[in-house]
């Protein structure tokens, strides 16, 4: 028995040491001592008044004013008072966040400069969103601008990336004191079951894949005014230059949703051709199939779109909801969807010459050998392809109004 215990003793000692290592907090950092960063905005370089005043007092270092980063930190004082939980929204309450802007030519060095202005360590593992202005996206390749984010092992690749019209830092401001703008921006994307003009989230992880593939892609755009923010349209990023080449408005962004068949909900509004009255179709399901066709050297596509949904608004109350009337309404909605799809196809195929709707993926899967020949100049091939489309809408429910 003693010899058995003797043999097991070294193993028991090792287990005990491992347990101490696992349960210990030797490298832990108190959350109160950390500057939790929830959002970063990237704008073209323009020193803030605070930076200029600090510079006059000697607080500067050698740099070019290429970009301005705005860090959004949680306001520890407000959090201690309970405002970050949604309370304290009165006039005298503190905002739940603090924004600090710094200008320079290196994201890493800008972060170091921010640390000279904060009494807490800049802590990025909780970074939720990066917002880039259109000016930045037009000027700098996005892979170069986000290189530091990709390399920083503190930053999670689930972080959302957005574009912004105007200054990106404006998207990190809210009128309400009790809410943190970063969480508002994330929350807007979660309304995709209600709105078909919201794109699937573009995270840092997805962005890496897009950049490596060389494909053109979209970034959800956000606009800001007077402390209010809204998802509105998308930025078109060219796969070769990695720069922004244009925008899609909300209507055109909805067209991308129909082509891809990615919508989880939304509303199509139109007008009955006969009565000219407003009607609204609530989307329950969208299904889309992009079919590539190759004949000799010619490449074409047909997009087959199907949808089911409910008639949720009908201002024409004089006509009975009979089969003939319903068929007419379905045709009206189908024509509206065709209009939406046609407009965005013209924009991406002929104006921007950028496939941001997934035609490349369909072609690659259907013709893998041909894909190897055309993938390097796919956007050019896409811009010359004939594209047809069909739409079939089925109204399945009519609300609580009974059919006459």
Swiss-Prot record:
Metal-binding in keyword set: no
Keywords, sorted A to Z: Cell membrane, Germination, Lipoprotein, Membrane, Palmitate, Signal
N-palmitoyl cysteine: lipidated positions: 25
Compartments reported by the entry: Cell membrane
Lipid-modified residues, S-diacylglycerol cysteine kind: 25
Chief place of localization: membrane
One GO term describing the cellular component: plasma membrane
Signal peptide start and end residues: 1-24
Membrane topology: Lipid-anchor
Biological processes per GO annotation: spore germination
Tree of life domain: Bacteria
Keyword Lipoprotein tagged: yes
Family: Belongs to the GerABKC lipoprotein family.
NCBIfam families in the cross-refs: spore_ger_x_C
Physiological role: May be involved in spore germination.
Protein name: Spore germination protein YndF
Originating gene: yndF
């Amino acid at each position: 028995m003693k010899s058995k215990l003797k043999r097991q003793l070294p193993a028991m000692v090792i287990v005990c040491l491992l347990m101490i290592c696992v349960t210990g907090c030797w490298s832990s950092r108190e959350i109160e001592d950390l500057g939790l960063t929830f959002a970063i905005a990237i704008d073209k370089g323009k020193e803030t008044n605070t930076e200029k005043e600090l510079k006059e007092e000697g607080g500067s270092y050698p740099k070019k004013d290429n970009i301005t980063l705005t860090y959004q930190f949680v306001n520890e004082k407000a959090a201690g008072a309970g405002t970050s939980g949604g309370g304290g929204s009165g006039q005298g309450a503190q905002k739940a966040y603090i924004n600090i802007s710094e200008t320079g030519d290196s994201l890493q060095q800008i972060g170091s400069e921010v640390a000279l202005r904060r009494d807490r360590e800049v802590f990025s593992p909780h970074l939720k969103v990066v917002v880039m202005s259109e000016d930045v996206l037009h000027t700098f390749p996005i892979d170069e601008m986000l290189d530091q984010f990709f390399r920083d092992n503190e930053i999670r690749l689930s972080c959302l990336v957005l574009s912004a019209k105007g200054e990106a830092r404006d998207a990190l401001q809210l009128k309400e004191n009790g809410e943190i703008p970063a969480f508002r921006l994330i929350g807007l994307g979660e309304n995709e079951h209600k709105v078909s003009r919201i794109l699937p989230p573009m995270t840092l992880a997805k962005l890496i894949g897009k950049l490596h593939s060389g494909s053109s892609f979209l970034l959800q755009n956000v606009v800001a005014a007077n402390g209010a923010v809204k998802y509105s349209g998308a930025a078109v990023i060219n796969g070769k230059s990695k720069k922004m080449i244009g925008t899609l408005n909300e209507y055109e962004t909805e067209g991308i949703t129909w082509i891809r068949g990615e919508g989880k909900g939304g509303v199509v509004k139109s007008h009955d051709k006969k009565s000219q009255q407003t009607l609204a179709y609530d989307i329950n399901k969208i299904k889309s199939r992009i079919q590539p066709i190759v004949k000799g050297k010619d490449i074409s596509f047909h997009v087959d779109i199907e949808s089911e949904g409910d008639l949720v608004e009908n201002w024409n109350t004089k006509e009975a909801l009979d089969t003939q009337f319903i068929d007419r309404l379905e045709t009206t909605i189908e024509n509206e969807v065709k209009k939406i799809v046609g407009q965005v196809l013209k924009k991406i195929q002929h104006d921007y010459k950028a496939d941001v709707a997934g035609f490349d993926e369909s072609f690659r899967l259907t013709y893998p050998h041909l894909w190897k020949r055309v993938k390097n100049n796919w956007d050019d091939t896409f811009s010359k392809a004939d594209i047809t489309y069909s739409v079939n809408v089925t109204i399945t429910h009519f609300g609580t109004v009974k059919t006459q």
